[in-house]
């Protein structure tokens, strides 16, 4: 593991990219003043071109069609405990294509260790405010299908996920991550504000209010390719950015121009991991020297 070494690669100075407003509760989610009406349509979307706009949605949405748009809506999500890992918006179906998730507030009324924010492939997520879910965004191609994930995540605000000590998938409680990438090609993560923080679901965890990671890259589903992580704000977590090769011999990621806070979990003696790369020899991470501490931008 070379996390301690990588911590020294977060530089100081002013980045070259044009100024972008940092996503927050005030500039993401349902636009101020937008009137919402209760959504009464199907929760499983099978009609291409369906538009859900300005709705209060009670229930988890399953997308099984092309060119679906969900915008300007408050997703209260389901009231049940899902039978397996899913999301308030589930885009795991092989029939999903060009899903647009724009300017939504995604905060479940009943959080669950199986309920993420948006999960799957073939989607664009912009200006969403996501909180109290298990993971914020889950990204991977369809197992056994195309190698392409085709996901763009931009301008989202993700924070305060829900930690559970009881988690059927992990003996040590939920591994909450703001964004988890498990495989696939063509992934862009840009201009997001991802805070790796948690609130207690059934009690505090080992790491207090720190999640697993703000962003974790682990190839559990497929090899990752053409993945760019650019100009985001990352903070908190056991490590703010974690990169693992997992099931494949190596992992390749571009990680550039990102802004890091200094509030990661302290493992002792001031040992913190803004960026943690589990294997230097099995990882190709370009752009490391272009990442900055947020408090040293000027």
Kindly give the residue locations of the regions a language model identified:
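Acidic, glycine- and Ser/Thr-rich low-complexity intrinsically disordered tracts
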Residues: 19-37, 248-298
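Charge-rich, low-complexity terminal tails
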Residues: 13-16, 138-143, 151
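Right-handed parallel beta-helix
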Residues: 49-56, 67-77, 95-109, 120-134, ...
């Amino acid at each position: 593991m070379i996390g301690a070494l990588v911590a020294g690669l977060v530089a100081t100075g002013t980045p070259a990219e044009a100024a972008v407003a940092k996503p927050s509760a005030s500039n993401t989610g349902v636009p101020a003043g937008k009137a919402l009406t209760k959504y009464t349509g199907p929760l499983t979307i099978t009609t291409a071109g369906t538009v859900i706009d300005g709705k209060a949605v009670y229930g988890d949405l399953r997308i099984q069609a092309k060119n679906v748009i969900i915008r300007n809506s408050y997703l209260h999500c389901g009231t049940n405990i899902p039978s397996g890992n899913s999301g308030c918006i589930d885009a795991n179906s092989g029939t999903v294509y060009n899903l647009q998730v724009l300017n939504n507030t995604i905060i479940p009324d009943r959080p669950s260790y199986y309920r993420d924010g948006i999960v799957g492939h073939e989607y664009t997520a912009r200006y969403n405010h996501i909180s109290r879910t298990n993971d914020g965004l889950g990204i991977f191609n369809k197992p056994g299908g195309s190698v392409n994930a085709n996901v763009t995540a931009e301008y989202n605000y993700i924070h305060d996920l829900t930690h559970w000590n009881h988690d059927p998938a992990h003996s040590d409680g939920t591994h909450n991550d703001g964004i988890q990438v498990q495989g696939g090609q063509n992934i862009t993560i840009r201009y997001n504000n991802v805070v790796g923080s948690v609130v207690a679901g059934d009690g505090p965890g080992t790491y207090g209010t720190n999640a697993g990671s703000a962003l974790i890259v682990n190839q559990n589903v497929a090899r990752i390719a053409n993945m760019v992580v650019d100009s985001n704000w990352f903070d908190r977590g056991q490590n703010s950015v974690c990169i693992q090769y997992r099931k494949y011999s190596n992992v390749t990621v571009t990680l550039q121009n990102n802004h890091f806070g200094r509030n990661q979990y302290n493992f002792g003696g001031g040992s913190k991991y803004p960026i943690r790369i589990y294997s230097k020899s099995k990882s190709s991470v370009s752009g490391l020297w272009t990442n900055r501490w947020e408090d040293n931008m000027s």
